[in-house]
Amino acid sequence: MTKRKKVVWSLIAIAVLILLVVCAYMVSVPKLNIVYEVDEHTYYQSSRSIFRHEIQVNGYDQVSNVLLNDKALYATAQKGGHRYFLFHDEAADTTISVPDDDHAFSRIYASFMYNGRYTVEYEYADGEEETKRMLVSIDFENKERISIELPQQVLAGRIVSDGRRIFGSDKDDIYLLNEDKSVKRITRGSEVISVEDEVLYYVFNGKLCQYDLNAQTNSQVQNGPDLLEYDLIDPDSFYTVQNKYFVGCRLSVFAYSDSHSFLTYTTIYDLQHGKKYLFMGNLGRIAENFQILNAD
């Protein structure tokens, strides 16, 4: 065997070894289905795959702020330079759209179901006016936008909902907005993250904490990440907690576009067992608005 062939076979052996190591690592990663946004486009990807699939609705671009419910999809999207709120029934292959109001400036930070309706955290301004923040719920049956004014206590950062109640912060304390619109301070904290199964996840002193809404007690999540390592550009959502897992994007300062950055990567934490994993298919992408659809 010539020296050149030896080099070639050595390189092939190294490549195969690296591939085997990567495959073994990805098999060890918890099997999650993750939805996330990059530059106002939404993708669906398995935590054990390097391949992503863009979520699309025929006739619309920049599908974002996605919520998936069985075979139905709620989202915002662009068409002809205008924003629309969408309800897409995949089984029936039908789409209902509600046009957004045209403002000089508008932005949507988050989406969730509230009182049975697709609802977004909405910021806008017209002309020289100061920006205003509120919730906008969409009545797809009557094709209407319903604006919901919120108290100042919950408007300083991210807003989350369990479908009936609203949770937010004033950067010092966490507040609950009840169904009767009464406001209650529940604990110290700078940012809410998510709420499920009567547990509210939030940030306090850079730590991931949880508040039991039934017992009205709080505690630090022992196996959680140091959230100071994850930039949270108010009130964008670069991480979430769902199904006992944390998924978050660690941003790097070496950005070369609005959606890509050297040394940026996404991590997965198993909060029950204290294990950390790398989301292999998302290296270099600035991702936000994560959803964990299921954990097998």
Q: Which residues does each PLM region occupy?
A:
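Generic signature of mature, soluble extracytoplasmic domains
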Residues: 68-69, 79, 83, 89-100, ...
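Repeated scaffold domains used in trafficking and secretory/extracellular systems
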Residues: 61-70, 103-114, 152-163, 188-198, ...
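Short beta-strand elements that form the blades of beta-propeller/WD-repeat-like
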Residues: 33-45, 65-78, 113-126, 160-169, ...
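N-terminal Sec-pathway targeting helices
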Residues: 1-19
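Eukaryotic tandem repeat interaction scaffolds
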Residues: 189-196, 200-213
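Membrane-interface motif at the C-terminal end of an N-terminal transmembrane signal
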Residues: 19-35
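Surface-exposed loop/turn elements that mediate protein-protein interactions on large endomembrane-trafficking
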Residues: 39-61, 81-101, 130-150, 173-187, ...
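N-terminal cationic leader/targeting segments used for protein routing and processing
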Residues: 4-7, 66, 70-72, 116, ...
